[in-house]
Amino acid sequence: MVPHLLLLCLLPLVRATEPHEGRADEQSAEAALAVPNASHFFSWNNYTFSDWQNFVGRRRYGAESQNPTVKALLIVAYSFIIVFSLFGNVLVCHVIFKNQRMHSATSLFIVNLAVADIMITLLNTPFTLVRFVNSTWIFGKGMCHVSRFAQYCSLHVSALTLTAIAVDRHQVIMHPLKPRISITKGVIYIAVIWTMATFFSLPHAICQKLFTFKYSEDIVRSLCLPDFPEPADLFWKYLDLATFILLYILPLLIISVAYARVAKKLWLCNMIGDVTTEQYFALRRKKKKTIKMLMLVVVLFALCWFPLNCYVLLLSSKVIRTNNALYFAFHWFAMSSTCYNPFIYCWLNENFRIELKALLSMCQRPPKPQEDRPPSPVPSFRVAWTEKNDGQRAPLANNLLPTSQLQSGKTDLSSVEPIVTMS
C-alpha cells in the first residue's frame, strides 16, 4: 500500500517539472542543439553526423529536471525500494540456505527470484535515480550497457522463474502422487532460465550509446540512449514487441492458466473421510487463503510491469513521445515489485515464518543445551512434503493414502494443502 501511495504522489509532482512548451524553453533548446557549428556542442570523437541527427530528434529525453522537493521525493521513493528489496531478498536467501529442511527445487526457484531482484536493485535502480535527479549520466560507457542489461535480464529471469514456480505448483496439486522436481533438475532449469534471459537481454544492452553534449556554456552532459542498427526504427519496434510478447504476455498467460486450474482444484476438492464442522471451516479458510495468494502473485506481477512494458512498446512504435515523468513513474512502479516477492513467496508462508523466528531467536540469545530443549510441536517440512533430494517420495507409512482413496482417484486435500503453502 505504501509504494502505491508514493506512486500517486510522485507522478503529478514529477509531471509538474516537465519543461513547458513556452517560447523561452524552445529557444534555449534550439540554441543548444541546432546551431550551425554543432561540433562545439557535441563530442565528435566516436560518432557520425547521423548520430547527431538522431540525438537532436531525442533531445527532450534529457530535459532539465526537478525542483528540490521533487528530488527529495524521488530519493525517498527509490531509497524505500532499495532498502526493503535488499533486506527482504537477502533474508530470503539466508533463511533458505541456512535450513536444510528448506532445500528443494521450489526453494531454488525462490532463491533465483530473490537473486534477480537483488541484481536489478543494485545495478539499475540507483543509477536510474541518479540519472533522473542530475539530468545526466555520470557512470561512464560501461555502466550504460550494464545497467540496461540488468534491467532486462532481471525482468526476464523473474518472469521465467515465476512461470517455473507456477508449473511446479500445478504439477504438485494436479498430480500429487508423482515425484517432485529434484534439486538437480531445478539447477538445470535455473541455468536454462538465465541463458534465455541473457540471450534476450543482450540486444538491449549492446545497442546502447553514450552521447555527450554541451548543455550550456558551463555544463556538459551525457545521455545513455538506445542506438539500434539500421533500419533502427523497425529494429527497435520489433525487438520490443517480441520481448513484450515472449517474456511478458506468454509467461503471464501460462501463470494465469496454471493458477486458475490449481484454484479450481483446491476449491472443488473435498476432504476425504469424516470431518467435524470446525475442521470443515478451517479447511475452507485455508483454501481461500491459498487461492488469494496465488491470485495475488499474478495480479502484482502483471500490474507492476505492465505500465513500463506498455510505455516502452508504444515509444518504440512511435505512438507516443518520450515523457520523463511517465517513464520514471512507471520505472519506479516496476522496481517496487522487488519488494513484494519476499512477502508473497516466503513471509506469507507459515513454515518460513517459523524458520525466520527461530533464526532471529538464535541471534538474540544463545541456544539452550540440546537435552533441555522440548520436542518441537511443529511438524517438519518432510512430514507434509516428503521428497528426497533426487525428487522421489520418501516411503513414510503415515503419509501413504489408503487403498480406497487411491482407487477412487480423489485427492486428499489435507495432504496436498501443506505442499501448496510451503512451495
Curated annotation (Swiss-Prot):
Swiss-Prot/TrEMBL keywords: Cell membrane, Disulfide bond, G-protein coupled receptor, Glycoprotein, Membrane, Receptor, Signal, Transducer, Transmembrane, Transmembrane helix
- What does the record give under GO molecular function? G protein-coupled receptor activity; neuropeptide receptor activity; neuropeptide Y receptor activity
Enumerate the Cytoplasmic topological stretches: 93-107, 168-186, 261-293, 349-423
Residues with attached carbohydrate: 37, 46, 134
The membrane-spanning stretches of this chain are: 72-92, 108-129, 146-167, 187-208, 239-260, 294-315, 328-348
Similarity annotation: Belongs to the G-protein coupled receptor 1 family.
Q: What does this protein do?
A: G-protein coupled receptor for PEN, a neuropeptide produced from the precursor protein, proSAAS (encoded by PCSK1N). Acts through a G(i)- and G(q)-alpha-alpha-mediated pathway in response to PEN. Plays a role in food intake and body weight regulation. May contribute to the regulation of anxiety-related behaviors.
Protein name per Swiss-Prot or TrEMBL: G-protein coupled receptor 83
User: In which organism is this protein found?
Assistant: Homo sapiens (Human)
